[in-house]
């Protein structure tokens, strides 16, 4: 592709302001910029800062290849997560979601108009929770909109047709959205979709690959609601690191990586529940007892869900302060407890890591599978129960810790320990670990020369620069 053709197209990435969404669009932006495209990333100021600070797996200099833009929105409440809430969904983020949806359109429209005047084409890649971006792209004489699928494409099949043959044949269960999300958020999503209904969308870019969801990609592409859209399965968007990369991270290395360097191969359980989930104190105690009882090496990231603005003041010490002190002393030499941000990609790529106990967010699921690590599935909310179904029943690269029907219960230590020991010590666990390793190799092949994801990325770039 000629350089002038590439430079005459502006790509504008418009993420939804939550960590798993910010991260995926920044990875895609970096991929496109590495291919010579002019890429612009537009989000509220604290979320631009958050995305830049937390991205892992790239040379820090790569961020200089992207132009970042602030979408100013009015002040909003940024409370801590409500630990007494009846639902595990992070409803404390709703004031920010509402403020963003109401105010981000105007500064985005102004940015698109400026870029439209100086480029042959403006390709707007928007998180599908931001349908207003498609409407604004359509207002340009030279604009096109492409949705970014930040969840499994199979999740869309469940949303559109929960009784579909493919779901039935594999014994999968799709939960209605209001069973695992708050009513406020479901209403918000439906309201956004209804307001922007009819906005033309040229295609769908998916953070998945045929090695994981090939059957579902074909079935969803044939659904009437996607008629006329081009499908580009370009995942995984996250960088694929090697064990050597995890051992030679440039700059000052995180303590977790230095600790992993000293552990035997495939001996460590990594435990983390993402950025939008909290565990009750009673559940923390049961999980701690299970980890100790299993006598397995571990890295445990214990932190509460993000605030809407992660840079807002958080007063006081951790609510787990007493536990942290005692547990750290009791497990000294066996494991590592982290209360801040952890370099998850590098941890999963490290040869000492054997398995990942996870909330099953799609970001974490893709990162784990692309590095050949099985998942001990503990879904918390949103699409996560579906991801656990996909992992455990369809891909057979996961073991279920907590069935969704018990999501309101405290899971006892004995039940958790049993799954840890199955994953780390048993023949059946070894089979799951081997299956995850095979999937990891297939996922890596998909982004290598000649792979399906590489071809789809080439096709996407070719289409927007045509």
Curated annotation (Swiss-Prot):
Keywords (A to Z) from UniProt: Glycosyltransferase, Transferase
Positions bound to UDP-alpha-D-glucose: 342, 344, 359, 362-364, 367, 383-384
Q: What is its EC number?
A: 2.4.1.215
Q: Where are the transmembrane segments?
A: none
Reaction equations catalysed: cis-zeatin + UDP-alpha-D-glucose = O-beta-D-glucosyl-cis-zeatin + UDP + H(+)
One Pfam family per UniProt: UDPGT
Q: Which residues bind an anthocyanidin?
A: 21, 91
Report the active site residues.
21 (proton acceptor), 127 (charge relay)
Origin: domain of life: Eukaryota
MF GO annotations: cis-zeatin O-beta-D-glucosyltransferase activity
GO biological-process terms attached to the record = carbohydrate derivative biosynthetic process
Q: Which PROSITE patterns match?
A: UDPGT
Task: State its role.
Answer: Utilizes UDP-glucose as the sugar donor and catalyzes the formation of O-beta-D-glucosyl-cis-zeatin from cis-zeatin. May regulate active versus storage forms of cytokinins and could have an impact on seed growth.
Family assignment?
Answer: Belongs to the UDP-glycosyltransferase family.
Q: What is this protein called?
A: Putative cis-zeatin O-glucosyltransferase
The species is Sorghum bicolor (Sorghum)
């Amino acid at each position: 592709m000629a350089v002038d053709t590439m430079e005459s197209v502006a790509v504008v990435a418009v993420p939804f302001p939550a960590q798993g969404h910010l991260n995926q669009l920044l990875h895609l932006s970096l991929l496109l910029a590495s291919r010579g495209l002019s890429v612009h990333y537009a989000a509220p100021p604290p979320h631009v800062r958050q995305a830049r600070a937390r991205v892992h797996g790239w040379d820090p200099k790569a961020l200089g290849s992207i132009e970042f833009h602030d979408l100013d929105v009015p002040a909003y409440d940024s409370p801590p997560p409500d630990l007494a809430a009846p639902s595990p969904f992070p409803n404390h983020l709703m004031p920010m979601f509402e403020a963003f949806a109401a105010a981000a359109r105007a500064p985005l429209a102004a940015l698109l108009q400026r870029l439209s005047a100086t480029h042959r084409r403006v390709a707007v890649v928007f998180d599908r929770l931001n349908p207003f971006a498609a409407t604004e792209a359509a207002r340009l004489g030279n604009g096109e909109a492409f949705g970014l699928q930040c969840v499994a494409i199979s999740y869309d099949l469940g949303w559109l047709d929960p009784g579909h043959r493919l779901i039935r044949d594999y014994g999968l269960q799709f939960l209605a959205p209001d069973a695992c999300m708050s009513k406020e958020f479901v209403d918000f999503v439906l309201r956004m979709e209804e307001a922007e209904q009819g906005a033309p969308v040229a295609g769908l870019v998916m953070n998945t690959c045929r090695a994981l969801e090939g059957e579902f990609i074909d079935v969803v592409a044939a659904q009437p609601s996607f008629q006329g859209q081009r499908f580009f399965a370009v995942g995984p968007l996250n960088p694929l690191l090697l064990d050597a990369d995890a051992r030679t991270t440039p700059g000052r290395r995180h303590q977790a990586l230095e600790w992993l360097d000293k552990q035997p191969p495939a001996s460590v359980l990594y435990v983390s529940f993402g950025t939008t989930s909290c565990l009750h104190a009673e559940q923390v105690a049961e999980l701690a007892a299970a980890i100790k009882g299993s006598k397995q090496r571990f890295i445990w990231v214990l932190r509460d869900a993000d605030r809407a603005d992660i840079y807002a003041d958080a007063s006081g010490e951790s609510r787990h302060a007493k536990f942290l002190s005692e547990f750290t002393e009791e497990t000294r030499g066996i494991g590592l407890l982290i209360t801040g941000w952890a370099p998850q990609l590098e941890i999963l790529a490290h040869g000492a890591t054997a398995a990942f106990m996870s909330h099953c967010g799609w970001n974490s699921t893709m990162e784990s599978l692309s590095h050949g690590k099985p998942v001990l599935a503990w879904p918390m909310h949103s699409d996560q129960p579906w991801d656990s179904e996909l992992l455990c029943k369809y891909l057979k690269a996961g073991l279920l810790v907590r069935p969704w029907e018990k999501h309101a219960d405290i899971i006892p230590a004995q039940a958790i320990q049993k799954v840890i020991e199955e994953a780390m010590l048993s023949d059946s666990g070894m089979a799951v670990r081997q299956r995850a390793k095979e999937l990891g190799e297939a996922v890596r092949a998909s982004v290598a020369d000649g792979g399906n994801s590489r071809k789809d990325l080439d096709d996407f770039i070719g289409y927007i620069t045509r």
